[in-house]
Amino acid sequence: MKFYFIRHAPTYANKSGIMVNGYENADIDIHDKPEDWEERVGQYIPEEARRVIISSPTRRCLSTSKMLFGRYPDEVTEALGEFDCKNLGNRKFWEISEEEFNSLVYLPSSTMAKRANEILTDVGNLIKKEHNTDSVVAISHGMIIRYLYHYITGHPDVSAYDIINSKGYAFSNLDLLVADVNPGVCNLVFSYHYSKPMERK
């Protein structure tokens, strides 16, 4: 199965660079598709892969599907949902220490690895069986996709603190990560960046 992972379009919180309470309900403007997204990123997603779209259940991911592809996802799965970091409240996570982060967010690498395996194996097999396809567009979140990158490239023990701070791999809104997953083997194909990562101030 070849996955085309896309991070959702930016919400007001992404644009402001802060975490906010109730972010799980944040939405985007479905009429605000960047004119150059297809040229810079979308061109790397073949028509066959666009036939089936899966997504996190959050509004911003559902709306990103509608914005980019003109329709809502064919399937919605909690496996693509965001890791739970709500206890951070409105803190700027790059301004807090790793110790403080870990006191607020319990997210060991084993938990993230379990989720990655669920996406790449269980969800992939289900989509292949139900839709008779070998490729799928998957719309998800920054932390999930950044962790998948590390997992696929042989670094499953990376910390949640490093993931949320984009250490070792930055992945911004509307970026694309392509991963080719075969039985027992995950291969990173490439990542295509729509925009530069936000500068932290």
Predicted regions and their residues:
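Active-site-proximal alpha-helix that buttresses catalytic centers in soluble enzyme cores
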Residues: 2-75
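Acidic, low-complexity terminal tails and accessory targeting/binding regions
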Residues: 1-2, 44, 75, 82-94, ...
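A short acidic, glycine-rich active-site loop
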Residues: 23-33, 105, 161-170
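Beta-strand elements within well-structured catalytic alpha/beta cores of enzymes
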Residues: 2-6, 54, 131-144
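Generic structural signal for well-ordered alpha-helical scaffold segments
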Residues: 39-43, 117-128
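Phosphate-handling substructures
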Residues: 24-29, 68-122
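Active-site signature of alpha/beta-hydrolase-fold catalytic machinery across serine-
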Residues: 67, 147-151
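Short, solvent-exposed loop/turn segments at secondary-structure junctions
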Residues: 9-12, 58-61, 81-82, 142-145, ...
